[in-house]
């Protein structure tokens, strides 16, 4: 995937956050709504739960969002298949499912969803449905932080290779969300160069195709760059 400088130049910069992140707790279930201020509706709703929660309870909560035009994502701390006998019905409640995610990985996923429309390079929520294969909606998320583009590129490429081997993950669609510490001097041509470089390395080393890129500035980063990859 190659992004041209002219293409980026035509995308208007975000002066005000377009999203608001709303967190709700219902016993052992964390619900994160990514609310679009532009359309006054949720673009994403993420459910984070443990394998001790009964399917009926989660299904009841997801049904409350059924009429919303949102991407609904289920995230289990362990395997969703060991919750109870209704796990198949539960999986079907979600557009996408993630398993065995730590709290840190879940927050990485929230950031990637937030980056969908919040950054200087952005897309649409339903781009995420590209991750869904014909027979399964199981997806994966990994991240890497570093003080240079080379650092995050090397780290993320190695993590991707390990994940593909360990979990026999499908080599299909890959969404990448690049975050950078806030900078007064944002040069979009430099961003384009960085993104194209990362894409080339990832695609060469993993044989995966980078389908979508998001880019936004994050003042809360510990290091200069962070790259979050979501794939099926």
Each language-model region and where it sits:
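Tubulin/FtsZ superfamily GTPase core signature
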Residues: 1-232
């Amino acid at each position: 995937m190659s992004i041209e400088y002219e293409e980026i130049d035509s995308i208007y910069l975000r002066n005000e956050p377009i999203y608001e992140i709303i967190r709700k707790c219902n016993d052992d279930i964390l619900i994160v709504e990514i609310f679009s201020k532009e359309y006054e509706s949720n673009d994403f709703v993420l459910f984070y739960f443990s394998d001790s929660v009964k399917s009926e309870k989660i299904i009841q909560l997801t049904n409350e969002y059924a009429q919303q035009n949102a991407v609904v994502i289920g995230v289990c701390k362990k395997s969703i298949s060991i919750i109870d006998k209704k796990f198949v019905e539960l999986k079907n409640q979600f557009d996408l499912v993630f398993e065995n995610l730590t709290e840190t990985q879940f927050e990485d996923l929230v950031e990637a969803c937030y980056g969908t429309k919040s950054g200087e390079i952005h897309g649409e929520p339903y781009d995420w449905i590209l991750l869904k294969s014909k027979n399964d909606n199981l997806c994966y998320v990994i991240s890497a932080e570093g003080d240079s583009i080379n650092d995050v590129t090397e780290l993320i490429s190695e993590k991707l290779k390990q994940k593909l081997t360990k979990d026999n993950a499908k080599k299909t669609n890959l969404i990448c969300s690049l975050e950078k510490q806030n900078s007064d001097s944002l040069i979009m041509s430099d961003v384009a160069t960085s993104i194209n470089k990362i894409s080339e390395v990832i695609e060469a080393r993993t044989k995966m195709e980078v389908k979508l890129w998001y880019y936004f500035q994050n003042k809360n980063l510990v290091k200069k760059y962070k790259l979050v990859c979501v794939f099926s």
